[in-house]
Amino acid sequence: MSEQVYLDLARTILEEGHYKGDRTNTGTYSLFGYQMRFNLQEGFPLLTTKKMPFGLIKSELLWFLKGDSNIRYLLQHNNHIWDEWAFERFVKSTDYTGPDMTDFSHRAQDDADFKVVYQEQMRLFNDRILADEGFAKQYGELGDIYGKQWRAWQTRSGETIDQIKNVIEMIKTNPDSRRLIVSAWNPEDVPSMALPPCHTMFQFYVNDGKLSCQLYQRSGDVFLGVPFNIASYALLTHLIAHETGLEVGEFIHTLGDAHIYSNHVTQVKTQLARSMHAAPKLWLNPDKKSIFDFDVADIKVENYESEPAIKAPVAV
């Protein structure tokens, strides 16, 4: 079963991982260079050993595919995946005049009183993003992250490259090409991004009427982030296969620094002690032909049964 390869990764890191410091000052157990393979013919790889919020996964992917990099669209779909990074930019600006939010991510974990204050400031921030278009334009923006690089890569001549549209056209017209690649890692833009791309580059491969995808991910938060990435890129593969008239093949997930944060170890052990359920099936609206026409209601998982969700703090 596909989920087992993910559980094997988590178990291997706990048993063999190296303890390392990190940018967030949380600490991680880490391995370098790990690959997982998921046969998409066997079902959709949405984890069942903990409940996964598929609504957030599909709305984030559609946000990327729109070429958007502002959290307003996500908030309109009740998706808070990127809130902390936009909020961090705001509280570091001269326009923020509220309570001290220094190191809010760690303080909210350790100080219950501060957590209440932080959550109220975050609520006010999100409400203002939704209500005030000008404020959203300034402080909801995350920089030239995934969507911008996928759909509007800036060239030296001032033009833009739509990598997603180009790769779809190449799959249709030259499926044997070894250049079916999309990159989100633009060294010139990295300093201006709220979070430089963790999933940096992906490549498609067509064989025997099936579309496969390999992702290279430079950094993988194995408990919180990687399960999202697996489902997101599996969904992307299905969507592009749908438009190009192909079946799905494999999703291959290659990780650089694969890590478990030190404050996620208990949660990972809880998950590893659980039993798996059968993989769900993915439904795509057959009336939609282009991936750019899909909305959240056009994508569903069917027969999804899982163990309960497991909460864990996000390292910002």
Curated annotation (Swiss-Prot):
Keywords of this entry: Cytoplasm, Methyltransferase, Nucleotide biosynthesis, Transferase
Disulfide bonds: none
UniProt catalytic activity: dUMP + (6R)-5,10-methylene-5,6,7,8-tetrahydrofolate = 7,8-dihydrofolate + dTMP
Positions contributing to dUMP binding: 23, 178-179, 218-221, 229, 259-261
GO MF assignments: thymidylate synthase activity
SUPFAM superfamilies listed in its UniProt record: Thymidylate synthase/dCMP hydroxymethylase
Keyword Methyltransferase applies: yes
Protein name as it appears in the record: Thymidylate synthase
Name of encoding gene: thyA
